[in-house]
Amino acid sequence: MKIAVVGAGKWGSALYDALSVKNECAITSFHEKDLSYFVSTKEALGYEYLVFALYAQGIHEWLVNNFKDLNQKILVASKGIDCKSLKFMDEVFGEFISSDRLCFLSGPSFASEVLEKKPCALVISGKNQNLCSKFASFFPNYIKTYTSLDVKGAEICGAYKNVLAIASGVCDGLNLGNNARASLVSRGLVEMHRFGQFFNAKEETFLGLSGAGDLFLTASSNLSRNYRVGSSLASGKNIKDVLIELGEVAEGVQTAYAIHALSKQFQIYTPIVNEVVLMLEGKNAWESLKDLMSSKEEIS
């Protein structure tokens, strides 16, 4: 099968490597490279199957500038919420392509370990279960794939866990110990589920690979960019310097503002996200911790 991966960052490169095991693959590049597997955006749009691994905040602009109403089937591997429109990825892509040609990839998966061909399990969500199964068949045997109808739940989990990973990184950056991190992540899972309930996401999604699985991975490892952002914030650095030092995109930073705006709009109780936003804006990490410890909790 011919598949083009759009986005040549770490995640896009890892997906290209995995999908190349069983398929004829190419990957887009924004720079001139003398490598046969790199193709231009125009060439990529000629492929029947596309896998998007772009930074979430850049996807709408990419679609406006490049997308033509062809018959591609698309797997979205980007995790985030568009900050300008406060739309989830299915809504962003839905402006350009029908939902029966869209699937979404989620689950615990560090790009570096996928490149090392270490085993992992992922979820492919979509309204068209035949297409989900088709995309699932493209992956090699060291990546176990499941399918799901709960697009919104998978999207919320994939976006929200990045913000919770920032909070977890702060916790570890302050050397508060394993008990504190476990408490924070557990409360974060409850908060993420509460947010998802408003959007009619399915409860089982939050307890599976897309939810608890991805959250526990991202919130407990220095391989996570968002976790490293939190750890740096705990040391007293401002977010501008943290991101310069990181040198990579940390989706959780922009996603925190998007979730915060949505929670205010719909009056959803999200204390951890609220404190992450305040820390991004300069609030002392210790003060945020104290406020979280004294905040009310609707569900334990």
Swiss-Prot record:
It is found in: Cytoplasm. Its EC number is 1.1.1.94. Gene3D superfamilies: N-(1-d-carboxylethyl)-l-norvaline Dehydrogenase, domain 2, NAD(P)-binding Rossmann-like Domain. Pfam families: NAD_Gly3P_dh_C (PF07479), NAD_Gly3P_dh_N (PF01210). The active site is at residue 161. Its main location: cytoplasm. It catalyses: sn-glycerol 3-phosphate + NAD(+) = dihydroxyacetone phosphate + NADH + H(+); sn-glycerol 3-phosphate + NADP(+) = dihydroxyacetone phosphate + NADPH + H(+). NADPH binds at residues 11, 33, 79, 111, 225, 249, 251. InterPro entries: 6-PGluconate_DH-like_C_sf, 6PGD_dom2, G3P_DH_NAD-dep, G3P_DH_NAD-dep_C, G3P_DH_NAD-dep_N, NAD(P)-bd_dom_sf. Keywords: Cytoplasm, Lipid biosynthesis, Lipid metabolism, NAD, NADP, Nucleotide-binding, Oxidoreductase, Phospholipid biosynthesis, Phospholipid metabolism. Belongs to the NAD-dependent glycerol-3-phosphate dehydrogenase family. NCBIfam families: PRK00094.1-2 (NF000940), PRK00094.2-1 (NF000943). This is Glycerol-3-phosphate dehydrogenase [NAD(P)+]. It comes from Campylobacter lari (strain RM2100 / D67 / ATCC BAA-1060).
